């Protein structure tokens, strides 16, 4: 794949996780909740296979879904935007970010007031719309800043744009960010500007997040280091504190986020387009607006076909979420839920992946699809979902042809191998048996020795097939000796295609194979590097 479009439907949870009660959640299910609303529309997502995901039996399934689908369980100890996105990018957080159910401690506020020159109001967990109703008038009269938090790890500053201009509010947020470190390192400091008069205050689009930097290397960092594009649409750049981003596209609504993502399809680039659609969470989940959430989902569902239609041959679309925010559970906080995973593209096999542990699965899968070695703390699904590409098809067919020349009068088992060199040449080999048994040479070594004898020392891929009576019959992995010989010239990352040959149609059997690597076949192996000085 050349381009991956990763779209986070912010807060679209699909059912409570087993540990939800530890996070204060019970009977939460964001998607099921909005599916009961008359505004809910589901046609495009149904065709992709959303109703086929584990736990979504209340939705109609699809006999032949277009996407590979599954359900992801979060491993991090949290249910907020920052930790959710960090895990999607490859980092699992074993400890939750600090929260302040009783407000921020005295030493934090005193330092903040000293450095800003302004006193503060509130200092309690509050709804963003309710806090300006309660304190907005006093703020306008006194100039005191409205500081509040929520169940998430956030330090929020609300201020009227006529009292505190946006640039000044952002400076205050930077001051707060510099103070909130160490044990008080909240996930985000958020600017919450508003306008209007008492009784009719309205929050504006000038929100800005000042996030804690990720504690380790992310998928975004890896792709940027490798020279690939990382285009951040919506609040992605804010969430990652600008790290690992090559392009930033600001948006103010789901509609604008979808529009900018669609425009990116027309560009030529290699890498990742990472979009967050925040309205689901900010406008509807937190505000307990089931109808609004359902309507926003319907708008996305209606938009989706225009995106799918414009996708190119080597594009991959990944749809997922970062946490839940059930709009009908009676409170305004995020919810600890599974999130959906849908992967669509012309190179994707539409399989049901079941339930997988770890949002970091997304980072590992995207990385492998883009040819990056990064895996983070996730396990890639790419080998399970990728359809054979032209290079793989050619290599498997070459191995199959080599199998026809096998000399195996004693075992009756014919094996063929094809080794792809770094310069694009294919070297084939078959097993050659001997009456004395020990001089027998396997197909893999035959192919490798042929290549090495012609001066080739660098390889990109290996394919192996086998069977009896020259009929493919199951997987034939390399023997131990072959694995050691291959290790002499090949890295543990060498892709290995093990032909399964389960199809009764010989023309199709060559396309049925299992992807693995030399390292997976030969873990903790001994190589020449251990003998070098």
Where are these regions (language model features)?
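Feature captures the catalytic ectodomains and active-site-proximal regions of enzymes
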Residues: 1-387
């Amino acid at each position: 794949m050349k381009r991956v479009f990763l779209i986070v439907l912010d807060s679209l949870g699909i059912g409570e996780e087993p540990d939800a009660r530890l996070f204060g959640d019970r009977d939460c299910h964001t998607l099921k909740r909005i599916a009961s609303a008359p505004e809910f529309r589901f046609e495009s997502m149904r065709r992709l296979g959303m109703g086929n995901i584990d736990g979504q039996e209340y939705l109609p399934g699809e006999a032949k879904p277009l996407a590979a689908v599954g359900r992801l369980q979060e491993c991090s100890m949290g249910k907020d935007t920052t930790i959710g996105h960090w895990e999607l990018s490859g980092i699992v957080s074993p400890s939750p970010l600090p929260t302040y159910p009783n407000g921020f401690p005295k030493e934090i506020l005193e330092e903040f007031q000293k450095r800003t020159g302004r006193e503060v109001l509130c200092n309690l967990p509050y709804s963003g719309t309710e806090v300006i109703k309660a304190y907005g008038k006093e703020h306008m009269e006194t100039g005191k800043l409205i500081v509040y938090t929520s169940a998430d790890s956030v330090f929020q500053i609300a201020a009227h744009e006529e009292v505190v201009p946006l640039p000044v509010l952002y400076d205050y947020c930077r001051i707060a960010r510099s103070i909130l470190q160490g044990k008080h390192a909240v996930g985000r400091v958020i600017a919450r500007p508003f306008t209007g008069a008492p009784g009719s205050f309205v929050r504006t689009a000038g929100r800005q997040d000042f996030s804690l930097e990720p504690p380790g290397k992310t998928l975004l960092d890896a792709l940027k280091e490798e020279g690939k594009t990382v285009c951040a649409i919506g609040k992605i750049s804010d969430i990652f504190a600008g790290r690992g981003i090559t392009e930033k596209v600001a948006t103010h609504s789901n509609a604008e986020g979808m529009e900018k993502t669609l425009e990116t399809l027309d560009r030529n680039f290699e890498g990742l387009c990472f979009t967050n659609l925040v309205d689901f969470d900010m406008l509807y989940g937190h505000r307990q607006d089931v109808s609004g959430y359902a309507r926003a989902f319907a708008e996305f569902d209606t938009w989706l076909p225009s995106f799918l239609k414009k996708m190119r041959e080597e594009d991959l679309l990944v749809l997922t979420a970062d946490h839940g925010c059930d709009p009908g559970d009676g409170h305004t906080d995020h919810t600890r839920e599974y999130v959906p995973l849908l992967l669509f593209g012309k190179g994707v096999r539409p399989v049901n992946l079941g339930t997988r542990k770890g949002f970091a699965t997304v980072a590992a899968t995207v990385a492998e699809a883009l040819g990056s070695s990064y895996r983070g703390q996730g396990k890639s699904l790419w080998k399970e979902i990728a359809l054979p590409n032209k290079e793989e098809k050619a290599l498997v067919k070459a191995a199959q042809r080599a199998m026809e020349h096998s000399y195996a009068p004693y075992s009756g088992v014919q094996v063929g191998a094809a080794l792809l060199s770094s310069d694009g040449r294919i070297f084939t080999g078959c097993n050659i048996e001997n009456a004395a048994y020990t001089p027998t040479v396997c197909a893999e070594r035959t192919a490798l020795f042929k290549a090495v004898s012609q001066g080739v020392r660098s390889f990109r891929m290996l394919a192996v097939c086998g069977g009896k009576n020259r009929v493919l019959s199951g997987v034939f992995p390399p023997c131990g000796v072959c694995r050691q010989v291959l290790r002499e010239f090949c890295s543990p990352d060498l892709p290995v295609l093990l032909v399964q040959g389960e199809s009764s149609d010989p023309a199709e059997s060559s396309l049925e194979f299992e992807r693995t690597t030399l390292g997976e076949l030969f873990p903790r192996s001994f190589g020449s590097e251990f003998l070098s000085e």
